[in-house]
């Protein structure tokens, strides 16, 4: 990707627009600030040496990520029309539920919330259905089509569980350059929205900066063991037919990285946990269709543009042979059905506040372990 192409992608993904708001100054939304930061970065990248360094650190094609989100919005809209009584995507809905379970375990109010990318339809819908404390939600996404889809599902007059109207704004923006005021929201929630950014520590730091003191950052991303079956099948097929291996699945973070990411974002009381979800599909092609509907197909800059037919057929055969979906009595498991693993990494952190628990300074203890042992021995 040339420098000019990179600049165009950055500007496009940083431009933001809001729906239903005519106020010149918003207490939460900061579109102008995002545009100014985009212009400043574009100016810096006129330095060819710096631009080359930045390009070398890029992993994902953000223009393609946006295109995938546009397509996912269309496919989810079509799925919702076909099954209006169901969620647009059952897996995204379930993973949104699991993420929000962590929010519901916290006994405090979150009046202003940013919903950032990923499964934003499921998160927004569930927040409204299950909470009574929300006053304002800002939905941020790289794709305007996805924002339009979420708005069509939520409706023109959103209300929370107790019937109170909730103000919702839909803002197109980049996760790496959030159009949100600093120190303005009580929580940032991102369900599967951050594993497609090129600067994950920077994106998390940007999100953390929008939180008020003692505000909550709650996120889930797909982990490195996601789609391990697909990786193996493609690697074996390429090795057999082409004598080498290419990146067929986008690179993802591992659980060991998450604690460090929370620390680099200056978030306190970090917590990380993992879920493994195994899904069954009628065929490898059905898996790929589902990945497209979620917006989760490969957007890596180093991806191959296509897979030769011979290799693709071999990969399909190997996948079905090595990773068949277990047959469930009474089900309609078809021959050739396969399973796929989704590893979900959950990250929780808090904006620092004096009321939070913190470790004592080294050397501040007033009782030694030896004295404590003597005391305990004396009680026996």
Question: In which residue ranges do the predicted regions lie?
Answer:
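Conserved catalytic/acceptor-binding region of the Class I
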Residues: 218-286, 294-305
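N-terminal chloroplast transit peptides
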Residues: 1-2
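Class I SAM-dependent methyltransferase SAM/SAH-binding core
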Residues: 101-187, 201-205
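C-terminal lobe and adjacent flexible extensions of AdoMet/dcAdoMet transferase-like proteins
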Residues: 30, 104, 265, 285-380
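A short glycine-rich, Lys/Arg-flanked "PGG" loop and its adjoining helix->strand segment in the class I
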Residues: 201-216
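Short catalytic micro-motifs in class I SAM-dependent methyltransferases
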Residues: 192-195
């Amino acid at each position: 990707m040339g420098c000019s192409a990179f600049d165009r992608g950055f500007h496009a993904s940083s431009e933001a627009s809001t729906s239903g708001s005519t106020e010149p100054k918003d207490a939460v939304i900061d579109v102008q600030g995002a545009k100014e930061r985009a212009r400043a970065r574009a100016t810096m990248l006129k330095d060819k040496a710096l631009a080359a360094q930045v390009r070398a650190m890029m992993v994902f094609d953000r223009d393609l990520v946006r295109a995938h989100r546009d397509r996912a919005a269309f496919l989810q809209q079509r799925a919702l029309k076909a099954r209006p009584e169901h969620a647009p995507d059952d897996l995204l809905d379930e993973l949104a539920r699991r993420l929000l379970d962590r929010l519901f375990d916290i006994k405090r109010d979150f009046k202003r919330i940013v919903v950032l990318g990923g499964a934003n339809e499921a998160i927004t819908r569930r927040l409204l259905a299950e909470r009574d404390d929300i006053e304002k939600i800002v939905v941020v996404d790289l794709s305007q089509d996805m924002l339009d889809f979420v708005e069509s599902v939520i409706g023109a007059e959103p209300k929370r569980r107790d019937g109170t109207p909730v103000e919702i704004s839909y803002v197109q923006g980049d996760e790496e350059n959030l159009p949100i005021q600093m120190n303005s929201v009580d929580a940032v929630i991102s369900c599967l929205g951050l594993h497609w950014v090129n600067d994950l520590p920077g994106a998390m730091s940007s999100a953390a900066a929008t939180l008020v003191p003692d505000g909550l950052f709650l996120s889930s991303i797909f982990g490195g063991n996601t789609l391990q079956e697909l990786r193996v099948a493609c690697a074996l097929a390429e090795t057999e037919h082409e004598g080498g291996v290419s990146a067929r699945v986008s690179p993802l973070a591992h659980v060991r990285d998450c604690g460090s990411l929370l620390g680099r974002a200056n978030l306190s009381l970090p917590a990380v946990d993992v879920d493994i979800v195994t899904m069954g599909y009628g065929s490898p092609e059905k898996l790929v269709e589902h990945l497209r509907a979620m917006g989760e197909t490969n957007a890596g800059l180093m991806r191959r543009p296509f897979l030769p037919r011979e290799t693709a057929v071999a990969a399909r055969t190997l996948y079905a042979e090595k990773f068949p979906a277990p047959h469930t009595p009474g089900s309609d498991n078809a021959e050739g059905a396969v399973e796929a693993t989704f590893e979900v990494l959950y990250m929780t952190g808090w904006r620092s506040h004096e009321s939070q628990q913190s470790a004592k300074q080294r050397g501040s203890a007033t009782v030694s372990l030896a004295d404590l042992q003597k005391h305990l021995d004396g009680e026996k």
